[in-house]
Design a protein with these regions (language model features):
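Reductase modules of NAD(P)H-dependent flavoproteins
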Residues: 5-11, 85, 144, 148, ...
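Short, conserved phosphate/pyrophosphate- and ester-handling motifs at nucleotide-, phospho-/glycolipid
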Residues: 41, 125, 218
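Ferredoxin-reductase
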Residues: 2-96, 151-153, 180-181
């Protein structure tokens, strides 16, 4: 059954499924209207109607859309902080109605395929990039895509397996994952460790000044990486950012 339209104000949708995609992180899948057009990398407001509990932060949150446009549902993914909104989202019955507003934002892939895209993601900041790289793969875009993905441990990394599989099947996509707290992990890790820095980028990119950079993650990380890129003589017009605060 298709989601119900609410002209100019988004539409009513239903919660279809939910699942844990990393420790302390859940993905929520909702109906998508055939008229809900969005670009990979955009976000949307999600409002719970009559939730079982509420608090001063209210019943609406803005989430990047983690699913690509070619899928017939919408996925929102979030760290499960202990708030009334997220407790409600975790426990309301499947089939619960919500309101989803029209998509917003311009954190989207550039059109000039001659310039590579370099995505720098921290934790839940992976969500817009997941949508972008999956849609690019689906559309067979010629862009060269490089994703540097930082987490504390493999246990904390949402969609790591999806991205690793995508790298194996798409020659235009390169994935570099790094873990910053492997001493606290119970899993084996053979990839990079430590924070994303200029040395790490230089080890995987032939020309730091050539690509368009996209940075998404905690505000301190975003600010630090932007400063690092500017110091490396990357044109500020080639740096695009999105903060993920409070997640």
């Amino acid at each position: 059954m298709a989601a119900s339209e609410i002209p100019m104000a988004g539409y009513r949708s239903k919660l279809l499924t939910r699942a844990e995609v990393a420790e302390g992180t859940m993905a929520f899948h909702f109906e998508k209207s055939a008229r809900f057009d969005f670009k990979p990398g955009q976000a949307a407001d999600l409002t719970l109607s009559n939730p079982p509990e509420t608090d001063a932060e209210g019943n609406t949150r803005t989430f990047s859309i983690a699913s690509p446009p070619f899928e017939n549902h919408l996925t929102f993914t979030t760290r499960m902080r202990d708030t009334a909104f997220k407790r409600s989202l975790k426990k309301v019955p499947l089939g619960t109605q919500v309101k989803i507003n029209p998509p917003t934002g311009s954190f989207t892939l550039h059109k000039n395929s001659a310039k590579a895209a370099v995505f720098l993601a921290g934790g839940i900041g992976i969500t817009p990039f997941l949508s972008i790289v999956r849609q690019a793969d689906h559309d067979r875009l010629p862009h060269k895509l490089h994703l540097f993905y930082s987490n504390r441990r493999p246990e904390d990394a949402p969609f790591l397996d999806v991205l690793q599989m995508l790298e194996k099947t798409n020659p235009n996509f390169r994935l570099v994952c790094t873990m910053t707290e492997m001493s606290k992990s119970k899993k084996e890790w053979k990839g990079e460790t430590g924070l994303i820095n200029q040395e790490m980028l230089s080890g995987h990119l032939t020309n730091l000044q050539g690509p368009i950079y996209y940075i998404a993650g905690p505000p301190a990380m975003v600010a630090g990486l932007r400063k690092m890129l500017v110091a490396a003589n990357v044109d500020e017009d080639d740096i695009r950012t999105e903060d993920f605060a409070g997640y």
